[in-house]
């Protein structure tokens, strides 16, 4: 199964992506449903930041995920604020992906 992981650009200053990759590789937390499934990570990316919003570059990233055949995109826990509300850009990105036949999972580790 081809999957991708998307994270928050603002959190990138302190995140190496190790916890997301660890959860995927060990098939724990949001990746537990794949415990008997071979996974291919086709992309690991970030949004373009709050200020950029759904700009041409972000749309290009999402289109690329579809072109690469991503069947599922996991949005990292960093795409929600402390209260648990999802970033509006991530919500729009998820909607775009779902409209193009890509399953969206909110969560990684």
Language model features by range: what are they?
Residues 39, 68, 100-102:
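A structural motif corresponding to the C-terminal end of an alpha-helix
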Residues 54-87:
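Mid-chain, well-packed structural core segment of small domains
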Residues 1-62, 86:
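Conserved mixed alpha/beta catalytic, RNA-binding, or beta-rich assembly cores of soluble enzyme
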Residues 31, 44, 82-109:
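Short acidic, glycine/proline-enriched helix-loop-strand junctions
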Residues 25-29, 64-68, 95-98:
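Short, surface-exposed linear patches
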Residues 8-9, 46-47, 77-78, 107-109:
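Fold-independent oxyanion-binding glycine-rich loops
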């Amino acid at each position: 199964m081809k999957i991708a992981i998307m994270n928050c650009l603002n959190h990138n200053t302190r995140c190496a992506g190790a916890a997301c990759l660890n959860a995927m590789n060990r098939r724990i937390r949001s990746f537990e449903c794949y415990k008997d499934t071979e996974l291919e990570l086709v992309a690991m990316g970030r949004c373009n930041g709050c200020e950029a919003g759904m700009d041409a570059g972000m749309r290009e990233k999402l289109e690329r995920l579809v072109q690469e055949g991503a069947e599922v995109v996991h949005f990292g826990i960093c795409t929600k604020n402390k209260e648990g509300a999802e970033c509006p850009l991530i919500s729009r990105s998820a909607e775009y992906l779902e409209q193009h036949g890509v399953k969206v999972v909110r969560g990684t580790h």
